[in-house]
C-alpha cells in the first residue's frame, strides 16, 4: 500500500484486507481471518509491550475503497483485546452514515477504544473534526492524566465553533 516511500519511523504495518489483490485463492471468510491474523503474527514478532495501538479504517478509502471481509474487524478486535492493545478506528471517511450505519465500526460490530472523525460531521462544508474515546482511555485520562492540553488543525475556526451552540 505504501510503496511511494517510507512513513514515520517506528510504525509497523500489516497487509490490507484486500481480497482482490491478495486473497483470490481463498474464500472471503478464509481471507478475512488470514489477513487479520497477520496482526497477531506482527505482535508476536515485535512483542505486545512494544505496540501501543492498532490503527485502521473500517473501509480503506485511500487504497481504492477496500471493503474487508465481514470477519476481519471482529478478529482484529479480538486480537487487540487478547494482547491489551488499543484499537483506534479512523472514521474520517466511513463515519456518519456512509456505510448505512452511523459508523463503519457499527457495520462490523466492533467497539474501538478511540474513533477519529471529520468530514461527515459537517458534510465537508466546515473544517470540523473530533475524537471519541471509550472508558478504557477516558478513565486513565481523567484519573491519572492531569491537564489535557491539545491543539488541532481545525482549532479555533469561528464558524465550526459556532456549530457547538446549535
Where are these predicted regions, by residue range?
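Conserved N-terminal phosphate-binding loop of PLP-dependent enzymes in the Aspartate aminotransferase
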Residues: 1-164
Amino acid at each position: 500500500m505504501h510503496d511511494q516511500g517510507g512513513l514515520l519511523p517506528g510504525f509497523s504495518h500489516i497487509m490490507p484486507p484486500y481480497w482482490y489483490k491478495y486473497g483470490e485463492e481463498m474464500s472471503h471468510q478464509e481471507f478475512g481471518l488470514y489477513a487479520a491474523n497477520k496482526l497477531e503474527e506482527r505482535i508476536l514478532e515485535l512483542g505486545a509491550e512494544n505496540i501501543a495501538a492498532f490503527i485502521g479504517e473500517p473501509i480503506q478509502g485511500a487504497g481504492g475503497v477496500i471493503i474487508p471481509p465481514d470477519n476481519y474487524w471482529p478478529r482484529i478486535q479480538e486480537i487487540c483485546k487478547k494482547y491489551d492493545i488499543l484499537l483506534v478506528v479512523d472514521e474520517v471517511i466511513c463515519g456518519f452514515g456512509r456505510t448505512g450505519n452511523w459508523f463503519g465500526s457499527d457495520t462490523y460490530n466492533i467497539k474501538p477504544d478511540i474513533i477519529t472523525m471529520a468530514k461527515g460531521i459537517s458534510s465537508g462544508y466546515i473544517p470540523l473534526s473530533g475524537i471519541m474515546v471509550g472508558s478504557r482511555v477516558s478513565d486513565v485520562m481523567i484519573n491519572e492524566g492531569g491537564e489535557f492540553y491539545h491543539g488541532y488543525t481545525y482549532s479555533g475556526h469561528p464558524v465550526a465553533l459556532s456549530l457547538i451552540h446549535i
